[in-house]
């Protein structure tokens, strides 16, 4: 009996932490959960005493509420009943009040035990435990960070901006110069592609060209936005810039794709709360420096880890590493790019986190050419605060663990990718037969990059 009482006390303590428990009902009933889930929820449960609809296990037996209460009252009063008939009455829902003796006998026969009935002290203790639990839950909820109405509005604005500048059908790709894939170049790039897809378990990588796929329908690019801007810089003559590049059959198509993506990045940036408060010169400086990084971020939506490619609709617009090599880029960019894409994909970001990360990337006060760094920093800090609050409120563990730090690390990785892209772009653009394939927008945005 002591073992039974001990196990019962343990059960009472665990039951006190069941959420949304009705205090009086739980305290009085001492109902048990269905053993091992043996009962199908869709099958009606029958009271073992009277045949009425059962509500669960009460005092170690499946009974209805009426028989549960009858047994509890009888045991507490130590009632002694006598059957007025032959002591073998059949108890039903309709006649269960007629013979209390046979009803109580039936309760005992199906396994109901008085040891499962709480004493008055236990009832009080249970009520106190339930009340304490509710108070703890209320305190926990009150201390939980919440997105303010203003913060939610910023997120909604960024989501709308992304949806307006991201065409998931990729229908505009048909307007680009068609992709031309050289079989010879493809064979040359096959080894490179296989190397890239081998061991990307924990690192991240990301691609400019895959990203263009995400750009969608915002407002058309305004060429004058980038005109008359003097961001001249000395040309870093490096050995790679003197390399003679072969025929690049994919360059025209991917140049159009990147140009299209730049337009979408501009459309997205113009809708970031606070961006239009900056001077036109600072807006241009931020866009020119961050465009390729945001394109890489956007491209993650179409990136597929199964074959390390960017799938943008039909097979014509499925881009592999070999396609990008046929546009003039080498594995010095593509290998870390794919690693970046894999790492970013594994973070399983919510769309809200993704758009906030893009906005934070654009609003970086340390971009070259930015004049009002204080204003840019204040806008970025606001976006960072919203991102951290969102993660605490809306991103459940374990995915939320160190998520903000991991996202910020992705921005650092993008800087390295940006620098390598600049080097390879210069090498490409210095050869007239290749630079003539680029669009005016690409030439304007990447032409004066500061690496």
UniProtKB/Swiss-Prot annotation:
InterPro entries: DBD_VDR (IPR042153), NHR-like_dom_sf (IPR035500), Nucl_hrmn_rcpt_lig-bd (IPR000536), Nuclear_hormone_rcpt_NR1 (IPR050234), Nuclear_hrmn_rcpt (IPR001723), VitD_rcpt (IPR000324), Znf_hrmn_rcpt (IPR001628), Znf_NHR/GATA (IPR013088). Zn(2+) 1 binds at residues 47, 50, 64, 67. Residues 113-149, 120-149 are annotated as: Hinge. Keywords: Cytoplasm, DNA-binding, Metal-binding, Nucleus, Receptor, Transcription, Transcription regulation, Zinc, Zinc-finger. Disulfide bonds: none annotated. A zinc finger (NR C4-type) spans 47-67, 83-107. It comes from Gallus gallus. This is Vitamin D3 receptor. It is found in: Nucleus; Cytoplasm. One of its GO terms (molecular function) is nuclear receptor activity. Calcitriol binds at residues 261, 298, 302, 329, 421. One of its GO terms (biological process) is calcium ion transport. Pfam families: Hormone_recep, zf-C4. Nuclear receptor for calcitriol, the active form of vitamin D3 which mediates the action of this vitamin on cells. Enters the nucleus upon vitamin D3 binding where it forms heterodimers with the retinoid X receptor/RXR. The VDR-RXR heterodimers bind to specific response elements on DNA and activate the transcription of vitamin D3-responsive target genes. Plays a central role in calcium homeostasis. Also functions as a receptor for the secondary bile acid lithocholic acid (LCA) and its metabolites. Expressed in kidney and intestine. Belongs to the nuclear hormone receptor family. NR1 subfamily. Its main location: nucleus. One of its GO terms (cellular component) is cytoplasm. The lineage of its organism: Eukaryota, Metazoa, Chordata, Craniata, Vertebrata. Homodimer in the absence of bound vitamin D3. Heterodimer with RXRA after vitamin D3 binding. Zn(2+) 2 binds at residues 83, 89, 99, 102. Residues 150-447 form the NR LBD domain. Composed of three domains: a modulating N-terminal domain, a DNA-binding domain and a C-terminal ligand-binding domain. A motif (9aaTAD) lies at residues 440-448. Residues 44-112 bind DNA. The gene is VDR. Residues 270-288 are annotated as: Interaction with coactivator LXXLL motif.
């Amino acid at each position: 009996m002591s073992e039974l009482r001990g196990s019962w006390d343990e059960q009472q303590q665990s039951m006190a932490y069941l959420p949304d428990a009705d205090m009086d009902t739980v305290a009085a009933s001492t109902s048990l959960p269905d053993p091992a889930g043996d009962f199908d929820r869709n099958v009606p449960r029958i009271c073992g005493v009277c045949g009425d609809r059962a509500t669960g296990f009460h005092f170690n037996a499946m009974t209805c509420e009426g028989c549960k209460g009858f047994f509890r009252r009888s045991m507490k009063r130590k009632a002694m009943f006598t059957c007025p008939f032959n002591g073998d009455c059949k108890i039903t829902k309709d006649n269960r009040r007629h013979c209390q003796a046979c009803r109580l006998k039936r309760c005992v026969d199906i396994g109901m035990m008085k040891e499962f009935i709480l004493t008055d002290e236990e009832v009080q203790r249970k009520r106190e435990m339930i009340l304490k639990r509710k108070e703890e839950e209320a305190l926990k909820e009150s201390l939980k960070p919440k997105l303010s109405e203003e913060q939610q509005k910023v997120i909604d604005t960024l989501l709308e901006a992304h949806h307006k500048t991201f065409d998931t059908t990729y229908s505009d790709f048909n307007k680009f110069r068609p992709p031309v894939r050289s079989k010879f170049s493809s064979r040359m790039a096959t080894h490179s592609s296989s190397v890239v897809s081998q061991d990307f378990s924990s690192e991240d990588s990301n691609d400019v060209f895959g990203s263009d796929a995400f750009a969608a329908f915002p407002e058309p690019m305004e060429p004058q936005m980038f005109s008359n801007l003097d961001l001249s810089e000395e040309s870093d003559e490096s050995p790679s810039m003197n390399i003679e590049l072969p025929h690049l059959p994919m360059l025209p198509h991917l140049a159009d794709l990147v140009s299209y993506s730049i337009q979408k990045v501009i459309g997205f940036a113009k809708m970031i709360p606070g961006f239009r408060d900056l001077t036109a010169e600072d807006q241009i400086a931020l866009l020119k420096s961050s465009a390729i990084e945001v394109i890489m971020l956007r491209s993650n939506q179409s990136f597929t880890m199964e074959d390390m490619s960017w799938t943008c609709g039909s097979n014509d617009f499925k881009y592999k590493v070999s396609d990008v090599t046929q546009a003039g880029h080498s594995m010095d960019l593509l290998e870390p790019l794919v690693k970046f894409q894999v790492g970013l994909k594994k973070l399983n970001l919510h769309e809200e986190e993704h758009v906030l990360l893009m906005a934070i990337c654009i609003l970086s006060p340390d971009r070259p050419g930015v004049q009002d760094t204080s204003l840019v920093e204040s806008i970025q800090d606001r976006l960072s605060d919203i991102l951290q609050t969102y993660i605490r409120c809306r991103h459940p563990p374990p995915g939320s663990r160190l998520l903000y730090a991991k996202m910020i690390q992705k921005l650092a990785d993008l800087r390295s990718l940006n620098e390598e892209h600049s080097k390879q772009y210069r090498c490409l653009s210095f050869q007239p037969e290749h630079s003539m394939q680029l669009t005016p927008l690409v030439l304007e945005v990447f032409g004066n990059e500061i690496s």
